[in-house]
Amino acid sequence: MSDSAGGRAGLRRYPKLPVWVVEDHQEVLPFIYRAIGSKHLPASNVSFLHFDSHPDLLIPVNMPADTVFDKETLFGELSIENWIMPAVYAGHFSHVIWFHPTWAQQIREGRHHFLVGKDTSTTTIRVTSTDHYFLSDGLYVPEDQLENQKPLQLDVIMVKPYKLCNNQEENDAVSSAKKPKLALEDSENTASTNCDSSSEGLEKDTATQRSDQTCLEPSCSCSSENQECQTAASTGEILEILKKGKAFVLDIDLDFFSVKNPFKEMFTQEEYKILQELYQFKKPGTNLTEEDLVDIVDTRIHQLEDLEATFADLCDGDDEETVQRWASNPGMESLVPLVQSLKKRMEVPDYEMVHQAGLTCDYSELPHHISTEQEIECLIQSVHYLLKNLPNPTLVTIARSSLDDYCPSDQVDTIQEKVLNMLRALYGNLDLQVYAAESPPS
C-alpha cells in the first residue's frame, strides 16, 4: 500500500518508520506531540488506531480542560486509562478506532459520533456520548453545556484470532494460505442473525484470496446458506475512515494479545465481590431523556465521591468507629466485612489502592484472559493481515503494560518480539527506540 492515509502535503517524512516502546501507555503521548511539533504529524485531523484490551478513553475527572494547552502539565496529569481524550479535546485526534480482542467489550460495538468539549459549569473535559463506559464515570453532559466542542468519530472493532483448521491432510500441514481475519461485531445486529459466532472475517475481495482461505475455520456459521452475517467489516470501510484524516498513528498495547486483571490477585474472591457491590453501576434503560441522563450521572458522581471520601478517611484511621460510621450510609453496609478481611491479611491495608480497584468494578470487570501461545500467534497474524491492507502509519507507539501487571510479565517480552517482527515484515527497517525503563521525552 501507499505510505499515506490521505493528503500529506507539507508534512515531513521519517527516513524509517519510528517505533517507540514505553512501559505505561500514557507515556506514548509525548512522542506523538513531538511528531506534531516536528511537522511529521499534522496538528489536527489525525486518525488514531488503538489495539488494546482497554479503551483508555476516560478523562482525568477533575483536570481543567485548558490543561491540554500546557503539555508539560498535561503529561503529569495523565494515567493509563485517560490519555487519549485530552488529545481529542486539544484538536489533534479526530478519529479513533479501538481494535479490541474478543474478551474486551467495554464499549458498544460499532460507530459512535459524539462531542468532546469543556463543561461550562466545571471547566473540565466532558463528552456527549451516552455509552455506559462514559456514564459510569460521570463523564456525560448535554451538548448545550459544552463549549469549544470537538467532534469525534469512534469506531469499535473486534479482532478475532483466526483459528487454523486442523483437518488438513498431513502434506498440507504447513500452508502459506493460513491467513487471519478481522472481525467487526455490531451488537445491534447480533440478535438478528443466527450465527454461532458474532462476526465474519475481513478479506480482500478477490477470488484468489477466498480460495486461499479454504483451510481456515469459519469464525461465523450461519444456519442458512442464503443468510449472510450482517457484521462483517471490510478493508474499504477502514480505509474510508483513514482517508478522512491527514495521517494516522498506529498504537499497540501488548496486553491486546494477553491480559490480566491485576486486582484479582490483590484481593480475595470475597473482597472483590464486595468491591463490585459497593461500586456497581446499574446500566440504565433505553429511551432516556436528557434529564434522565443528567440525573443518572449526578447520582453516579455522588456515589463515587462518597466512596473516595470513605477510603481517604480510612487511610487516616480504620478503627471500628470510623468504619461503622461510613458503613451506616445507604449501600455501604458491606464495608465492615471488607475492612475486617483486609486487616486479617495485611497489617496496614492500602485503602487508596482499594479505591482504585473499586473504580474498575462498575458495569463490567476488567478484562482477564491469559492467552496461550497459539492464541497470541493467531492474534499477531490477524493484526498483520489487517495492517498489510492499510496505508503505512506515520509512526508506531507500543506500550508494554507489564510493570502494573496488565500484560503478563512472563509473556510480555515474547509478545513484544513477535509484534516487532510483524512490523518489520510489514514496513521494513524500523527506527526502534525503547524507553520502557526510562522517562519519555518532554
UniProtKB/Swiss-Prot annotation:
It comes from the Eukaryota. Residues 175-210 are annotated as: Disordered. Residues 189-200 have a biased composition (Polar residues). Transmembrane segments: none annotated. InterPro entries: UPF0489. Belongs to the UPF0489 family. This is UPF0489 protein C5orf22. It comes from Homo sapiens.
